[in-house]
């Protein structure tokens, strides 16, 4: 069953969302991230996705105080990404009790670190692949490179990582629906579980992802749709738990 994972993006200690990774388009949803995290757990989340946006952009861990408070309040696993560019930083977060650390920029710039960390900490390391039109972006999406996302998936499928998070930048924060072709292409290549991220704006969007479970998608990160009230977390969890094939067919027809 695909796991629904609510997201909290941290910027200057607050819970925010960006549109397509643009730091000039920031919407603040809650200035108390630990309170927001506890709400997601109370509503049924089994895992929380955290992103340190300051860290992603600058490489500096500017939101550790908020991260510690969230960890103290929750009993569910936490995965965190954003600015984790050294072995020491990754291990500090694991020592803090974070279940999984997500490495993006460093995975592209120094892939050997992924191999070392995943050997030492099996099932604790996740690679984040953020791409636009199939090309990977790094450093908080401020730097575009000519590397294909498919090549990265092939490489990291040979390591002991726990999963790969695939984010299509062109859909992230837009509520316009996921890039199913992009997700399907990567899922068919990968030999490790994939977690989809970006574009979810309705229950129909969730339903459209469910058939990809057979291709290796086992998680779905949702952010802005939950904060905007497009649907609530309990509803999303119920839909995945009680998925009906006819509902999926109808959802795909609606999107055709």
UniProtKB/Swiss-Prot annotation:
Pathway info: Amino-acid biosynthesis; L-histidine biosynthesis; L-histidine from 5-phospho-alpha-D-ribose 1-diphosphate: step 4/9
Keyword flag Cytoplasm: yes
Annotated protein name in UniProt: 1-(5-phosphoribosyl)-5-[(5-phosphoribosylamino)methylideneamino] imidazole-4-carboxamide isomerase
Signal peptide feature range: none
Keyword Cytoplasm applies: yes
Organism of origin: Prochlorococcus marinus (strain SARG / CCMP1375 / SS120)
Broad EC category: isomerase
Any one GO molecular function term: 1-(5-phosphoribosyl)-5-[(5-phosphoribosylamino)methylideneamino]imidazole-4-carboxamide isomerase activity
Any one biological process term the GO annotation gives: L-tryptophan biosynthetic process
Subcellular location: Cytoplasm
Top-level taxon: Bacteria
Active site residues of this protein: 9, 130
Cross-referenced InterPro entries: Aldolase_TIM, His_biosynth, HisA_bact_arch, Isoase_HisA-like, Isoase_HisA-like_bact, RibuloseP-bd_barrel
Enzyme Commission number, as recorded: 5.3.1.16
Any Gene Ontology CC annotation: cytoplasm
Keywords on record: Amino-acid biosynthesis, Cytoplasm, Histidine biosynthesis, Isomerase
Family as reported in the entry's similarity comment: Belongs to the HisA/HisF family.
CDD domains cross-referenced by the UniProt entry: HisA (cd04732)
Catalysed reactions, semicolon-separated: 1-(5-phospho-beta-D-ribosyl)-5-[(5-phospho-beta-D-ribosylamino)methylideneamino]imidazole-4-carboxamide = 5-[(5-phospho-1-deoxy-D-ribulos-1-ylimino)methylamino]-1-(5-phospho-beta-D-ribosyl)imidazole-4-carboxamide
């Amino acid at each position: 069953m695909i796991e629904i994972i609510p997201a909290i993006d941290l910027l200057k200690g607050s819970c925010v969302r960006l549109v397509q990774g643009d730091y000039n388009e920031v919407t603040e949803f809650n200035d108390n991230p630990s309170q927001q995290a506890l709400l997601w757990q109370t509503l049924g989340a089994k895992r929380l996705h955290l992103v340190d946006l300051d860290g992603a952009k600058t490489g500096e861990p500017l939101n550790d105080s908020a991260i510690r408070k969230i960890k103290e309040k929750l009993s569910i696993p936490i995965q965190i990404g954003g600015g984790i560019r050294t072995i020491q930083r990754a291990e500090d977060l694991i020592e803090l009790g974070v279940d999984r650390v997500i490495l993006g920029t460093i995975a592209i710039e120094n892939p050997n670190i992924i191999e070392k960390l995943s050997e030492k900490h099996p099932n604790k390391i996740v690679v984040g692949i953020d791409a636009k039109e199939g090309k990977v972006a790094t450093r908080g999406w401020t730097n575009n490179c000519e590397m294909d996302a498919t090549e990265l998936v092939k490489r990291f499928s040979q390591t002991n990582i726990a999963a790969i998070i695939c984010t299509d930048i062109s859909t992230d924060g837009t509520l316009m629906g996921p890039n199913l072709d992009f997700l399907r292409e990567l899922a068919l290549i990968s030999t490790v579980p994939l977690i989809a991220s970006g574009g979810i704006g309705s229950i129909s969007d969730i339903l459209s992802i469910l058939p990809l479970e057979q291709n290796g998608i086992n998680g779905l990160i949702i952010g802005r749709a939950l904060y905007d009230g497009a649907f609530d977390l309990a509803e999303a969890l119920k839909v995945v738990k009680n998925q009906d094939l006819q509902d999926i067919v109808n959802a795909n027809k609606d999107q055709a």
